[in-house]
């Protein structure tokens, strides 16, 4: 049912008031009580009317629920009104911080729009409550009419009721005065009381103000107040006029009643009576109030007593139980309906009571102010709503106005039955009760307090029975108990008169009996006056010291009252401790903080005022102090400044004195160092001059002799002979250079030089004595040798040139003197031959056959072996290289016992590399070598290397260093070579650096002035130990080499890459450039790597990233299969494996009916009529004319017409086709008009030969004959068509869409025949060469009988034949500036028949260059570091012997040492080396002995890059070499060519020089 639904929806917060309840109290522990109500309807209504009424009631309930929800939302929106002012204030405060910014005000406007929309929504919601308000107004109008009628009756009976009421009240006052006092004090402690009387509920409109003021009766009228609140909230807006009008009517009645009340109120003598009298005038109906007050005061005592008995689980006892049963039986007789109530009571716990009291206290505190403000309006509203028929469901019974009046008059009030509101009541009454229920449920406070579940379990319209299950919570159970007690108390009041009549008799009997009375009374009651006057205050003496409050009570009652008041007292204390104490503590704390804040404010104000007073009074004192401090500060600054100036002057004077002293000391030190260096130089010069005079180096150098230098040298060395000078060594550290004169220093220097010479001779003599084995005749003593001119040894199988023979004499003299030397002839002058001639000279003249040690780079090992074998065949050579096992076997040939080698020794000369020297140092150091030759001695230029240290530790009689560049980078390398040959003279690198290095290197770098005297002294020191000759001085037939620097500009791609690298480098670019010019091994590795990246950009941008092959996406499916071979089937037909993923399925019905000819269509008839019946070739006359011209028969013409196009093309290519016949006809007509047989046959034979040639040209598609027969076509295709590149590159490519007809074999057979017809496939494809050979040679098939092939046309352009595009080589060439210049240069060099050496630093660049040369079809070979020794020998041999090789690609480090490449006349450096001497050695591979043509050297450089910086640094290093070795102070002249046409001119000029 919908009623059950309504009750179930509100079971959490609705209360159901049940009429006429029969209560059965049982002491159980259950938490709820089940009430089953059976309602019987009357016989006047039918079931149909009930259903209609219930349906209508349900609709009203639904509407009320909706309105309730709207009202709740309205309350939420109403809260915005309270905060509107606060929001406006907050916005005003925020607007101050917005600083008049447009964005901030835009944000404010958006907020205002938002809140405006919310306010409009609130107004719409507020207007939606009109329907509910109209319904409530109707109810109020009906109730007002009834109230007016009842009020008119009450006005007429006011006087009589007041008189009777005052009398009854005075009678009851003597017994209830003490009770009122105690209950009023108890009510103040508690939040709300737990009992209510039926009369108070009946007249709630007249006593509402007293209920609000008195806290003890607040909970009693809570249900009524909830109804008042709900109605007020509904009527506040729309019914103000009606309410005010009604309130005026009520106010007039209340005024009259107040007047009557003031007249009838008694005088109050005691304090309790005054309190009661002060509350009486506030009521609206004094007669009812007086009656209710008397009943309330008399009932409170019983209620409190009953509460205490409930706590002890003893609800009622003895007599009370019997009286309650009588009341219940009387009520059952008066009820019209049968209501069955089954209830259970719970045991109450003290904790639950306290919690409920706490909740009630909190709610009362919150409601206090609101109830006082709206008290008068609520009274008027309640009087308008309620009428005489209203009653509380929990009230056991109500009395009408007449009954109350009769009771006030003193008549006994008998309970009159009142019909409760049930389902069968009037509609208006039911609606009014339900509205009350709903309004009660709206109030959150009532929901919180009265949470009772009620569920309609069953409704039977036939039996007129409605069963409702009501579950009462603890609060309602307690309330029910109080209602029961109220019913009991009403019965007691009726019997009160009987008890009062017996009171006098009881007092008299007590006086007569005395102490023997069994009944113990505490105090005797006072007799009341008959006219209701003042009470007698005569009391019996209190014997138990318990408070009796002026009443007669037993000991048990006194204890119960005391216990009740104690509990109330402790409850109040607990509430105070729990609530008020915390509030007071917070309040005290807040007061203290406010007080402290005020103190601080006062103190700050006082301090500010005090400071103002001080400023006014002590301003002059403050100014005086300020001036005094300023004066003191200025005085201190003055004296500090004065002291600082004096201190600075003193320091300056001391500094000047120290500088002067330091300068004088430096001058003395410079003089001393100059004398020291002069002493050391003089010592070295004397030794060098003496050795030079012995070996005559000046005569050997030829044109390089300096006359002025020789004169100075002779003047310096006059009167000094080392042979006659005593050999006394004087340590220069012990010499006092400050006091010694020049002559004494020169004498000591001569003694030291003589000592060095003597030690050198002794060392040589000792080595010779060890190797002579004690022979008598010794020819190796150099002192016994005179100045003999040495001739060419006879065992030397070559003829030495004049300068080479002089070099042999110089080397022989060095050997005789026991001095080591450096043969530093320019590359290409035959240093190898001169060194081999010295070994031959020792073997031939002195019979010294070894052991000789030759150490050379790995690239020249085979060259040395070949040279020695060629020039001195008698020498036995031991090639010491290979793996460890090979070297172990070679070491067996060493003869360590015989230190003197002869011609029959196992070997004479051992040739090894520098790597082997380092790895096998322990074995090589054990040998004593007669002569050690180091080829390319710049390999030991570093004194810190392991090569230098290991070779210096070898036991050798003489050491010879062969190098064309003794100085590569700096003077330190020269000192390393000099110390290697003469450790005793050149022992300190620091001294050598002080002598020469600083001056010469600074001159080369900064072009400073060079000390010529110091340079001459250096040359004088070096001359005895180093022989240096250049080609132009000693070799007149060898022409000069031309060096050309070709400057190029970066291409666009290179420039972008270069800028990107510069931007990504964290280090400054200038620092990187300096690192590029500095070849010091200690440089930062990161810098070197950065330089290499820039050099890559200069060489070619593809060194970073190669161009990718471009190909479209293939939208195809590729075939996948396993092995295709089958048993007994050597040939397998393979269809096209690549197909399109898209397949079009043609419906078979369409193919059969519309495409294939059949009996249902006319396709066959149309084909016959078009191709046969109406064909022009079907005419007989036309066919005759055609056959006359072509020579074909009528049937052949028809076959040609009806044949396929491809078959006709194949037929035309046959030897005796129509074309051949036409050629025959044309030849006959050209030669002779007569058709004689002789002419015809001769011409026919000629035509047949041409047909054979034509067939041969077609068969040999790639042969020489094809090229000869198609010269024009070949040239046109190669020059024009193949030069065109594809400009469009598709993104996707795919195979054609395949068509399939499922279930039709005819289509698949026809498709396969067209795609794979053997005749067409053979005609389109070319016959393989192997098949042609078998047909022509083995099977003897004539060429003109070969089947037609190669009809598929070849593409006009190779780049258009496929969508796969390879990177363009033209773009590859033009993207590199160097490669573009090289491409132009090679064209000119190829025309001039030059042969070119191209040197590279990077092997990856060599790979790119090979691709370029292959594209240009230049023949070339390559040699780099990865080439093996055997391959290197073969490559050099091929280059020297094969003139068809145009270009030789070499790595500068691998191919620039010790090899002879004189077949080339042009050298191109694609990129330069860090060390200029490496490049010099590389170019001298071609510019050397045996070169008959002019040698031109091209060096490709990029302007404005790191390469230009490296080139400048290389020129500085070359200048140092020229200064030291040749004495030149001017740099070498190198021609520079800018980017343009000068390269071709230079190449042409070099070609002209070569031809001349």
UniProtKB/Swiss-Prot annotation:
InterPro entries: DBINO, DEXQc_INO80, Helicase_ATP-bd, Helicase_C-like, INO80/SWR1_helicase, P-loop_NTPase, SNF2-like_sf, SNF2/RAD54-like_C. GO terms for molecular function: ATP binding; ATP hydrolysis activity; ATP-dependent chromatin remodeler activity; DNA binding; histone binding. Residues 1381-1535 form the Helicase C-terminal domain. Residues 572-697 form the DBINO domain. Its main location: nucleus. Residues 181-198 have a biased composition (Low complexity). The keyword Membrane does not apply. The modification Phosphothreonine is found at residue 156. Residues 812-984 form the Helicase ATP-binding domain. It is found in: Nucleus. Its EC number is 3.6.4.-. SMART domains: DEXDc (SM00487), HELICc (SM00490). A motif (DEAQ box) lies at residues 935-938. GO terms for cellular component: chromosome, centromeric region; chromosome, telomeric region; Ino80 complex. Belongs to the SNF2/RAD54 helicase family. Component of the INO80 chromatin-remodeling complex. The DBINO region is involved in binding to DNA. This is Chromatin-remodeling ATPase INO80. It comes from Vanderwaltozyma polyspora (strain ATCC 22028 / DSM 70294 / BCRC 21397 / CBS 2163 / NBRC 10782 / NRRL Y-8283 / UCD 57-17) (Kluyveromyces polysporus).
């Amino acid at each position: 049912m919908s009623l059950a639904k309504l009750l179930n929806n509100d079971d959490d917060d609705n209360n159901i008031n049940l009429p006429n309840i029969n209560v059965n109290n049982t002491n159980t522990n259950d938490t709820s009580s089940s009430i089953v109500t059976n309602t019987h309807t009357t016989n006047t209504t039918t079931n149909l009317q009930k259903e209609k009424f219930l349906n209508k009631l349900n609709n009203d309930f639904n509407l009320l629920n909706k309105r309730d929800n709207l009202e709740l939302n309205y309350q939420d929106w109403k809260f915005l009104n309270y905060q509107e002012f606060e929001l406006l204030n907050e916005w005003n405060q925020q607007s101050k911080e917005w600083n008049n910014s447009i964005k901030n005000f835009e944000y404010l406007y958006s907020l205002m729009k938002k809140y405006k929309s919310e306010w409009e929504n609130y107004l719409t919601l507020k207007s939606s409550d009109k329907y509910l308000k109209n319904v409530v107004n109707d109810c109020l109008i009906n109730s007002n009419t009834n109230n007016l009628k009842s009020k008119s009756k009450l006005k007429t009976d006011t006087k009589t009721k007041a008189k009777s009421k005052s009398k009854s009240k005075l009678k009851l006052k003597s017994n209830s005065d003490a009770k009122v006092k105690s209950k009023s004090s108890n009510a103040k402690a508690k939040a709300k009381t737990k009992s209510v009387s039926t009369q108070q509920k009946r007249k709630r409109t007249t006593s509402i103000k007293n209920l609000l003021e008195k806290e003890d009766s607040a909970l009693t009228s809570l249900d009524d107040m909830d109804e008042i609140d709900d109605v007020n909230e509904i009527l506040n807006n729309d019914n103000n006029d009606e309410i005010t009008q009604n309130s005026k009517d009520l106010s007039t009645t209340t005024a009259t009643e107040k007047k009557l009340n003031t007249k009838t109120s008694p005088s109050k003598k005691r304090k309790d009576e005054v309190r009661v009298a002060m509350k009486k005038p506030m009521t609206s109906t004094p007669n009812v109030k007086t009656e209710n007050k008397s009943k309330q005061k008399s009932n409170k005592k019983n209620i409190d007593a009953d509460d205490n008995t409930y706590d002890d689980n003893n609800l009622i006892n003895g007599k009370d139980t019997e009286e309650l049963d009588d009341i219940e039986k009387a009520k059952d007789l008066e009820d019209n309906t049968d209501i069955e109530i089954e209830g259970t009571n719970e045991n109450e716990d003290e904790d639950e009571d306290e919690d409920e009291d706490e909740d009630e206290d909190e709610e009362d505190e919150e409601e206090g102010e609101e109830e006082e403000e709206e008290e008068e309006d609520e009274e008027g509203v309640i009087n308008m709503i309620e009428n005489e028929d209203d009653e509380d469901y929990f009230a056991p019974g109500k009395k009408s106005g007449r009954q109350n009046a009769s009771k006030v008059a003193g008549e006994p009030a008998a309970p009159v039955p009142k019909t409760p509101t049930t389902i069968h009541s009037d509609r208006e009454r039911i609606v009014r009760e339900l509205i009350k229920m709903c309004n009660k449920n709206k109030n959150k406070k009532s929901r919180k307090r009265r949470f009772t579940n009620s569920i309609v379990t069953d409704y039977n319209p036939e039996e007129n029975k409605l069963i409702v299950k009501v579950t009462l919570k603890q609060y309602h159970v307690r309330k029910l108990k109080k209602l029961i007690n109220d019913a009991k108390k009403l019965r007691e009041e009726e019997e009160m008169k009987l008890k009062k009549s017996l009171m006098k008799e009881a007092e008299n009997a007590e006086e007569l009996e005395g102490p023997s009375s069994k009944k113990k009374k505490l105090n005797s009651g006072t007799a009341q006056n008959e006219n209701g006057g003042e009470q007698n205050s005569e009391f019996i003496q209190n014997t138990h010291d318990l408070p009796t409050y002026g009443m007669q009570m037993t000991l048990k009652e006194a204890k119960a009252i005391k216990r009740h008041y104690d509990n109330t007292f402790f409850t109040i204390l607990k509430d105070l401790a729990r609530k008020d104490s915390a509030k007071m503590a917070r309040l005290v704390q807040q007061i203290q903080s406010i007080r402290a804040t005020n103190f601080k404010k006062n103190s700050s104000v006082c301090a500010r005022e005090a400071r103002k007073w001080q400023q006014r009074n002590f301003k002059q004192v403050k100014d005086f102090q300020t001036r005094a401090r300023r004066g003191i500060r200025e005085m201190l600054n003055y004296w500090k400044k004065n002291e600082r100036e004096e201190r600075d002057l003193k320091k300056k004077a001391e500094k000047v004195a120290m500088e002067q002293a330091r300068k004088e000391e430096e001058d003395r030190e410079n003089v001393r160092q100059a004398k020291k260096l002069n002493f050391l130089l003089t010592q070295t010069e004397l030794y060098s001059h003496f050795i030079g005079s012995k070996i005559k180096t000046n005569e050997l150098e030829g044109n390089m002799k300096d006359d002025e230098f020789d004169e100075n040298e002779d003047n310096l060395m006059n009167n000094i002979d080392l042979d006659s000078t005593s050999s006394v060594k004087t340590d220069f550290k012990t010499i006092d250079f400050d006091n010694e004169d020049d002559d004494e220093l020169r004498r000591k220097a001569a003694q030291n030089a003589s000592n060095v010479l003597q030690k050198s001779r002794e060392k040589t003599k000792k080595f010779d004595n060890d190797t002579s084995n004690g022979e008598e005749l010794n020819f190796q003593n150099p002192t016994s040798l005179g100045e003999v001119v040495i001739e060419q040894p006879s065992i030397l199988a070559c003829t030495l040139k004049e300068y080479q023979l002089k070099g042999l004499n110089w080397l022989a003299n060095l050997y005789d003197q026991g001095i080591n030397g450096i043969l530093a002839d320019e590359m290409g002058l035959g240093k190898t031959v001169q060194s081999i001639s010295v070994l031959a000279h020792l073997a031939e003249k002195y019979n010294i056959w070894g052991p000789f040690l030759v150490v050379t780079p790995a690239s020249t090992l085979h060259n040395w072996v070949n040279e020695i074998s060629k020039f001195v065949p008698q020498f036995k050579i031991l090639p010491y290289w290979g793996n460890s096992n090979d070297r172990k076997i070679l070491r067996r040939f060493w003869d360590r016992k015989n230190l003197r080698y002869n011609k029959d020794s196992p070997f004479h000369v051992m040739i090894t590399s520098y790597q082997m020297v380092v790895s096998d140092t322990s074995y090589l150091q054990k040998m004593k070598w007669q002569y050690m030759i180091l080829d390319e001695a710049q390999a030991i230029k570093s004194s810190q290397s392991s090569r230098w240290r290991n070779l210096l530790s070898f036991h050798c009689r003489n050491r010879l260093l062969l190098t064309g560049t003794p100085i590569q980078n700096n003077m330190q390398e020269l000192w390393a070579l000099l110390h290697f040959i003469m450790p005793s003279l050149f022992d300190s690198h620091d001294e050598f650096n002080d002598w020469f290095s600083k001056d010469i290197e600074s001159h080369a770098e900064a072009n400073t002035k060079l000390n010529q005297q110091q340079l001459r002294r250096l040359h004088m020191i070096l001359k005895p130990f180093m022989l240096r000759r250049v080609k132009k001085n000693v070799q007149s037939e060898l022409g000069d080499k031309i060096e050309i620097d070709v400057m190029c500009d970066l291409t666009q791609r290179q420039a972008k890459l270069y800028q990107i690298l510069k931007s990504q480098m964290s280090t400054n670019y200038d620092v990187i450039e300096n690192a590029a010019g500095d070849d010091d091994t200690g440089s930062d590795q990161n810098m070197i790597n950065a330089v290499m990246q820039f050099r890559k950009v200069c060489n070619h941008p593809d060194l970073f990233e190669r161009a990718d092959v471009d190909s479209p996406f293939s939208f195809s499916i590729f075939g996948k299969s396993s092995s295709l071979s089958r048993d007994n089937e050597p040939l397998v037909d393979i269809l096209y494996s690549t197909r399109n993923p898209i397949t079009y399925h043609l419906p078979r019905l369409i193919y059969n009916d519309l495409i294939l000819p059949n009996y249902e269509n006319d396709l066959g008839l149309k084909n016959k009529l078009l191709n046969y019946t109406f064909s022009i070739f079907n005419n007989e006359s036309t066919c005759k004319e055609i056959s006359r011209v072509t020579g074909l028969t009528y049937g052949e013409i028809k076959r040609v017409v009806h044949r396929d196009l491809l078959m006709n093309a194949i037929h035309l290519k046959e030897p005796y086709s129509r074309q051949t016949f036409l050629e025959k006809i044309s030849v006959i007509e050209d030669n002779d008009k007569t058709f004689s047989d002789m002419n015809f046959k001769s011409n026919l034979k000629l035509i047949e030969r041409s047909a054979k040639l034509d067939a041969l040209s077609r068969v040999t598609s790639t042969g020489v004959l094809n090229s000869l027969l198609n010269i024009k076509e070949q040239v046109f295709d190669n020059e024009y068509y193949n030069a065109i590149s594809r400009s469009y590159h598709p993104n996707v490519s795919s195979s054609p869409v395949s068509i399939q007809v499922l279930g039709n074999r005819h289509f698949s057979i026809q498709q396969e025949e067209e795609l794979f017809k053997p005749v067409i496939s053979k005609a389109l494809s070319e016959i393989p060469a192997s098949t042609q050979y078998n047909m022509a040679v083995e099977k003897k098939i004539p060429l003109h009988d070969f089947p037609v092939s190669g009809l598929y046309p070849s593409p006009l352009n190779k780049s258009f034949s496929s969508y796969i595009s390879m990177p363009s080589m033209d773009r590859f060439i033009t993207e590199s500036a160097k490669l573009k210049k090289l491409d132009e240069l090679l064209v000119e060099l190829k025309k001039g028949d030059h042969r070119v050496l191209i040197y590279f630093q990077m092997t990856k660049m060599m790979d790119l260059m090979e691709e370029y040369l292959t594209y240009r079809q230049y023949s070339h070979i390559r040699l780099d570091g990865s080439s093996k020794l055997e391959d290197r020998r073969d490559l050099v041999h091929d280059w020297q012997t094969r003139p068809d090789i145009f270009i030789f690609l070499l790595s500068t480090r691998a191919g620039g040492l010790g090899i002879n490449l004189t077949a080339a006349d042009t050298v191109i450096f694609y990129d330069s080396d860090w060390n200029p001497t490496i490049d010099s050695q590389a170019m001298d591979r071609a510019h050397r002995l045996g070169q008959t043509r002019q040698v031109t050297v091209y060096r490709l450089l990029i302007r404005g890059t790191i390469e230009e910086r490296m080139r400048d640094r290389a020129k500085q290093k070359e200048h140092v070499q020229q200064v030291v070795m040749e004495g030149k102070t001017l740099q070498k002249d190198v021609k520079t060519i800018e980017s343009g046409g000068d390269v071709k001119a230079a190449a042409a000029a070099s070609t002209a020089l070569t031809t001349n």
